[in-house]
Structure formats: C-alpha cells, structure tokens
Amino acid sequence: MKTILLLLVRAYQLGISPFLGQNCRFYPSCSAYAFEAIGEYGALKGSFLATKRLCKCHPWHPGGVDPVPKKSSSKKTSSTTACGCGHS
C-alpha cells in the first residue's frame, strides 16, 4: 500500500503539478510533504499527516515552513539516566 501511495504522489508531482504551477504556501510543498510522510511513517500515519497538511492549505492560512515531524527516539541506552546526561 505504501508503494502505491508513493507512486500516486509521484505521478501527481510529474503529471499534474507542472500544469498547476508552484502555488503551495508551504515549504516543502504539500506533495513533497506527503511523499516524505508516507515514506517515513508508512501508508496509514503518513496519509493521516498528509491529509492534516492538505487541510491547512487554504488562502486563510499563512503557510511557511512546515516539515514532516521527526520520529521520536523512545529507545533509552543503558548509560542514560533519567535526567539524560549519562552520569552514573
């Protein structure tokens, strides 16, 4: 499913977007955001993030830089303490 969605986004970028011009008020563009979100988080969560982004893409939103959120690293190493500084 992830591959199909990525192909659909890429098809939009190559086949439709060039005829519409660069009108996106965000950086990265909504299609680039969708491609990255689906690639990073998979079909379900990536599509959810892309849909959230598309819902913000309207004339009354100021736009700006809106990157795909980074995955949080919930893995703790054995040398890390509760405060995170690594002391024993």
Swiss-Prot record:
Biological role: Could be involved in insertion of integral membrane proteins into the membrane.
Record carries keyword Heme: no
Compartments where located: Cell inner membrane
Family: Belongs to the UPF0161 family.
Listed GO CC annotations: plasma membrane
Protein name, UniProt field: Putative membrane protein insertion efficiency factor
Protein source organism: Herminiimonas arsenicoxydans
Any one Pfam family match given in the protein's UniProt record, by short name: YidD
Topology within the bilayer: Peripheral membrane protein
